Amino acid sequence: MSLALGCVADDYTGASDLANTLTKAGLRTIQTIGVPEAGRALPEADAVVVALKSRSIPADQAVARSREAERWLRARGAAHVMFKVCSTFDSTDAGNIGPVMDALRADAGETVALVTPAFPETGRSVYQGNLFVGSVPLNESPLKDHPLNPMRDANLVRVLGRQSRSPVGLIDTATVARGAEAVAARLDALAQEGKGAAIADAIFDSDLEVLGRAILDRKFSVGASGLGLGLARALAADGRGTRDAAGAAVGEPVGGASACLAGSCSQATLQQVAAAEAIMPVLRLDPARLLAGDDVVAEALAFAEERLASGPVLIATSAPPEAVRALQAAHGVDAAGHAIEAALAAIAEGLVARGVRRLVVAGGETSGAVVDRLGLTAFLLGPEIAAGVPVLRTAGRPEPMLLALKSGNFGGADFFGRALDMMA
């Protein structure tokens, strides 16, 4: 295997989003869960996205896991490695974007890294270094209340500067408008100034293509799926990659039952859970009861077992921001989050034991916990359910499953029903 592009993603849903983007752009793409074991055979691919669950763990652990993934990708021919982060730049002043970026940039031998979470197609744009979600700055969007990484500053030069050991510069809209050569020259100038990173503006998808061309022959970059799109299109224009038809098939239909799990507390997921009540039985578990020691896992599995023969069910721990803050105040941010993730992962394991083979999961941390608990190691990419969310088919599992792993903020109100329809 000789890769045209290697990617290290800091969570599982983000990895699926990026792999979906690369597949649509014509690259044969595989998503692995963690670094594959030695000797594990994978299908031929143009790009591999190594999915880690490293966004909210201690920074030193995130760095170690990311470096291992980068080494694996380089050993398989990846001349360029992209560190995939969330399009809302989810992080705190302690990381993990800055520490991982610093380490991977140093390993790649680069002096400066281009960084942009922009993806205009999904409403994420960067102007003068400020990240916008739709028409509002990041710090005025619902992300200001993110339960793990509340985003209270839209200026990414400042945000990344507080995390990185190196100063951070800016590649502004005017420079991007002048084309790839101007962007490359600006990167070189910033490197001469001692900058270790450069936030790049991008307002239109065409800006992403400019950025992709500018960095294609550099060794490292940081971005969301939008930058992946720019790189994929640059690779295609350069004659690299196979240009497979977009939206690979997921093979033969998968039998068994269907279920949905929701752990995200984003406004989008809360709306999606409410909409799902019109089309399937929904069990809303009270996270406070879980943290008080009640056996909500057994309760959820009993609820599902009574209903799965008749159709899909949805089990949710999603709660509004004020309820989340109260739980975190009482139990601690990490303890509350980990307990809820572990419970949903145990429920997922129980659902699979009861015959579920099509599973939809809402929430990045929840998806990571579920995939780890089920022991899934790699996915093939299928059709797109909503922007950034593909159908995934397990690879290397004796009895295949179909999954959808959704970042909390992605998808319309009808997401759960739409996902199940596309998996049928």
Curated annotation (Swiss-Prot):
Function: Catalyzes the ATP-dependent phosphorylation of 3-oxo-tetronate to 3-oxo-tetronate 4-phosphate.
GO molecular function: ATP binding; kinase activity
Binding site for ATP: 264, 363-366, 408
Record keyword ATP-binding present: yes
The EC number(s) this enzyme carries: 2.7.1.217
Pfam families, A to Z: NBD_C, SBD_N
Protein name: 3-oxo-tetronate kinase
Xref: InterPro entries: 4-carb_acid_sugar_kinase_N (IPR010737), 4-carb_acid_sugar_kinase_N_sf (IPR037051), NBD_C (IPR031475), NBD_C_sf (IPR042213), OtnK (IPR050007)
Keyword field: ATP-binding, Carbohydrate metabolism, Kinase, Nucleotide-binding, Transferase
Gene3D superfamilies recorded: Four-carbon acid sugar kinase, nucleotide binding domain, Putative sugar-binding, N-terminal domain
Family that this chain belongs to: Belongs to the four-carbon acid sugar kinase family.
Reaction it catalyzes: 3-dehydro-L-erythronate + ATP = 3-dehydro-4-O-phospho-L-erythronate + ADP + H(+); 3-dehydro-D-erythronate + ATP = 3-dehydro-4-O-phospho-D-erythronate + ADP + H(+)
